[in-house]
Amino acid sequence: MKKLLAALGAFTLLPAIVFANEEKLKDGFYSFDAMGCMLLRECTEDVEEVISLLDVSSKYEHWEEFTPFSAEFNHMLSSLNRVGVRVFLADEKYFPVGHRGVYHTVSNNFFLNKTFMRRPSVLMSVMRHEGWHAAQDCMAGTIENSMIAIIMPEDEVPMLWQEMAESTYRHMPHAIPWEKEATWAGKTQGMTMKALDACANGKMWEVYPPTPLTKEWLTEKGYIK
């Protein structure tokens, strides 16, 4: 098991302007330095907490296109909030080029890149993907620690999603086991919602029996007997 900072993304451009808070950042905005500042909640300008889907959809003219996804989105958000995870919509300046969202295993918050959330399908994919990482955090004993564990045996992940994750995260090979199932969950309606329900209801290991290695670790740490 390893600490994991997971993110997906698409292309963005760096404007030639100066933002407030930039003096805090050694590498400026659109960098991992900026992302770290956001994750630690030291940079909060243009970072707004999401209380319901309306907090996202209202930012765009085509807000009505988000409506079909409201039940699943709000259900996931409710489960996340129940276990102490907060979700934020943040300006693109806090994300390195190519990042659409990120879950932080230490603060237990995740952040959505406002620029890319204008498409409902992308919003749901990122919400499910990052939400799955929160569920992996829950699988590793408790949301309170900074560890994550795979939820399903790797061979149960359909080959399509395994290959996609191996390609997308080829430069982060240590992350691939976690990203395989997160990629699958990101594209599958209801999958993350179910896992977050299990986490919020204290039934994670009942609904998803731990893999042998995870069970061994959970037993060693005293989470299960």
Cite the ranges covered by each PLM segment.
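Sec-dependent N-terminal signal peptides
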Residues: L4-L14
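A mature extracytoplasmic/lumenal domain signature
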Residues: D91-K93, K114-M117, C138-G141
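Catalytic Zn2+-binding segment of zinc metalloproteases
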Residues: G131-I148
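Metalloprotease/metallohydrolase-associated module, dominated by Zn2+-dependent proteases
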Residues: S146-K225
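Auxiliary, metal-adjacent structural segments of Zn-dependent hydrolase domains
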Residues: N21, D33-V106
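Short pre-active-site segment immediately N-terminal to the catalytic Zn-binding motif
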Residues: F110-M127
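Cleaved targeting-peptide boundary
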Residues: F19-F29
